[in-house]
């Protein structure tokens, strides 16, 4: 059972540590996002890219990455979803990075948190599918192209969609838990010097898991809004 500094707050304890950590990540994400927005300036300064390494430059780089990914996965409609998916990516990344602080555990290693993210994605892509195609046309996505196989395909598709929030949540929670466990073990054994490579690996894992979650969510949206021809 990993220690979390938030457990010292009265009423939090181990059971609600992930909720407290999620709250910290939310405040941090909003604060850093506001600082990055303020650094844009006004007029031409807001349009020109950052000329040096800065918080603004980091946000521009990651937003450009999200934009390119949306264009590649979703297509011409991808630009409409950039604000949403950029927010998802940054928020999950902030939650993951909190686990790199000694004495903190990321909210994303708790299945309750990651399943909540998965349910959000499930509701979002289905809503976009119905909005783009209409209820009847969207339901046809579940039936496949062969009429006599439609009942079987409908059941299979429904099950696969129901499983998606669990698969998204399990993947993120298990990987983050494993990474944090490895880092914690080496910090306990040799607290100086040796854990540095594991911190580097942890940073990579934090980024990759936020990227994978965002990528899979984009794929689900792309399939949901696709028009059958």
UniProtKB/Swiss-Prot annotation:
InterPro entries: ATP_syn_F0_a_bact/chloroplast, ATP_synth_F0_asu, F0_ATP_A_sf. It is found in: Cell inner membrane. One of its GO terms (cellular component) is plasma membrane. Keywords: ATP synthesis, Cell inner membrane, Cell membrane, CF(0), Hydrogen ion transport, Ion transport, Membrane, Transmembrane, Transmembrane helix, Transport. The chain crosses the membrane at residues 16-36, 81-101, 110-130, 142-162, 175-195, 196-216. CDD domains: ATP-synt_Fo_a_6. One of its GO terms (molecular function) is proton-transporting ATP synthase activity, rotational mechanism. It holds the Pfam family ATP-synt_A. Belongs to the ATPase A chain family. F-type ATPases have 2 components, CF(1) - the catalytic core - and CF(0) - the membrane proton channel. CF(1) has five subunits: alpha(3), beta(3), gamma(1), delta(1), epsilon(1). CF(0) has three main subunits: a(1), b(2) and c(9-12). The alpha and beta chains form an alternating ring which encloses part of the gamma chain. CF(1) is attached to CF(0) by a central stalk formed by the gamma and epsilon chains, while a peripheral stalk is formed by the delta and b chains. Key component of the proton channel; it plays a direct role in the translocation of protons across the membrane. This is ATP synthase subunit a. It comes from Bdellovibrio bacteriovorus (strain ATCC 15356 / DSM 50701 / NCIMB 9529 / HD100). The gene is atpB.
